[in-house]
Amino acid sequence: AHIDSLFYKGGRVGELMFNTVYLPLSDKEHQVDIHLFRDRNEVAAINAYYKMGQTDYLDGNMNITDLPLEMVNPFIPDNMAKLTGALQGELAISGTASAPDVNGYVRMDSSAVYVTAVGSSFRFDKQDIRIKDNLIRFDKYNIYASGTNPFIIDGTVDIHNPSRMMANLKLTAQNMQLLNVKRNKESMVYGKLLVNLNSTVKGPLDALVMRGDLQLLGGT
């Protein structure tokens, strides 16, 4: 499949091409290879083997080479945010179709998000986010705002049950300059905001419980 140039609400997603090969190995065994291209550059490849039986079995791999995050921007409502950079990673999925095991990693390469409401960009760490035995592991993962002191995420997100993913995270920051924005027409707030944060976030993703301390520092 080939789309010359896909636009959504005036925003360009890109020239997209899907290359798919399906192999029926037997009545109950199937294999599929999928390659995704954006602007004629391969950005992701998926290969999967599926075996039907009393218990269906799945074995697959996904290789994300350089998936441009700007592809998402047209789908963000009201230009609330703008993403830059690329997503990279490798994922392996195996086991029963009803409860597969996921392992691998994802990485944000030179990636940031600009949030229009606060007129600020937040830069993502290039550190790998590991996934082992259906646990997404954040190992002191850093997010930077306008200053040099980061917002730090440490802990796990359990994806064993996709309909009820569970978080167990610690969020910290020390003397973090969260905002440094001059008055402008787009931002809802302006000025400087410096904070200390020491908190936990736990529970299902649709009902998170956050506890901790947030301090506004001098210079705000």
Which positions does each model-derived feature cover?
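Interface amphipathic segments
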Residues: A1-E90, S98-T200, P204-T220
